[in-house]
UniProtKB/Swiss-Prot annotation:
It comes from Mus musculus. Residues 121-185 are annotated as: Disordered. This is NOP protein chaperone 1. Interacts with NOP58, RUVBL1 and RUVBL2; the interactions are direct and NOPCHAP1 bridges the association of NOP58 with RUVBL1:RUVBL2 even in absence of snoRNAs. The interactions with RUVBL1 and RUVBL2 are disrupted upon ATP binding. The keyword Isomerase does not apply. The modification Phosphoserine is found at S34, S66, S177. Keywords: Chaperone, Nucleus, Phosphoprotein. Pfam families: NOPCHAP1 (PF15370). GO terms for cellular component: nucleus. It is found in: Nucleus. InterPro entries: NOPCHAP1. The lineage of its organism: Eukaryota, Metazoa, Chordata, Craniata, Vertebrata. One of its GO terms (biological process) is box C/D snoRNP assembly.
Length: 185
């Protein structure tokens, strides 16, 4: 090994000899610890040759059939048949028969859920008033702007006000069920 320990930086050592010795040291370090094989160099390379002692062949093993797969394969044809039956019933039934908004009282038990999913903007919160609103309130101006006047109109997506979602858990109410009628009697 040409270069060990400190670098030779004197008047007699040229920069080309220092560079050459660093390359030699790097190669020696990469092959260190391996007697004849490539050492760490072969371990770092992806396409390195397999070690002759570690010639283990990978074996393909057949996995057992999953019971879940059997259940899914049995269920999917049933679901396809049910979908086809529903399509035929929808084609044969009157227009409003499958409309979930229009139900008759003979349908049996019905669960009605009012679900609102939205992101509340900062302008909707009552805690944060803008400086203009607070100055207008403090000035005592009795004239109302067009925005403040509530005129009943058709409810659209733009003007609907949804309830505050921070109220906690939702409340489930049972309306006109046979069980509640029995309790009242």
């Amino acid at each position: 090994m040409e270069f060990q320990g400190e670098r030779g930086t004197g008047p007699g050592v040229s920069s080309s000899s220092v560079a050459c010795s660093q390359v030699t040291v790097s190669r020696e370090l990469l092959t260190a610890g391996s007697e004849g094989s490539g050492g760490i160099w072969d371990q770092l390379l992806i396409s390195s040759k397999p070690h002759p002692r570690k010639t283990s062949t990978l074996q393909t093993v057949r996995m057992q059939r999953s019971p879940l797969l059997d259940q899914v394969q049995a269920f999917l044809p049933q679901m396809a048949q049910a979908n086809e039956k529903l399509r035929r019933e929808m084609a044969a039934a009157p227009a409003g028969h499958f409309n979930i908004e229009n139900i008759d009282e003979t349908s049996g038990n019905i669960i009605q859920m009012d679900v609102a999913l939205f992101e509340m903007s900062r302008s909707d919160s009552k805690e944060e008033d803008s400086p203009e609103e607070s100055s207008r309130d403090s000035s005592g101006d009795s004239s109302e702007s067009e925005e403040d006047v509530c005129v009943p109109s058709e409810v659209t997506i733009e003007n609907i006000k949804l309830p505050n979602a921070e109220g906690g858990k939702g409340k489930i109410e049972i309306l006109d069920s046979p069980a509640s009628k029995k309790k009242k009697q």
